[in-house]
């Protein structure tokens, strides 16, 4: 049986769902640059790298860095 990513836990580390999506996309791209496979095997289960990205955020394995608002620029 496949388990779901820890979205509720990941939401505790960000201010909004938008920020979680943005961070997960950036982490997924980072994972893809590190390896060729889109899937990762974890404990006998196969998951997409997007799953691994959300897990990394939920477990605090990655640090989410926010750009500070500068005059005339948008905050990310």
Swiss-Prot record:
Gene3D superfamilies: 3.90.940.10. Its EC number is 2.7.7.6. One of its GO terms (biological process) is DNA-templated transcription initiation. One of its GO terms (cellular component) is cytosolic DNA-directed RNA polymerase complex. HAMAP family: RNApol_bact_RpoZ (MF_00366). The RNAP catalytic core consists of 2 alpha, 1 beta, 1 beta' and 1 omega subunit. When a sigma factor is associated with the core the holoenzyme is formed, which can initiate transcription. PANTHER family: DNA-DIRECTED RNA POLYMERASE SUBUNIT OMEGA. This is DNA-directed RNA polymerase subunit omega. It comes from Aquifex aeolicus (strain VF5).
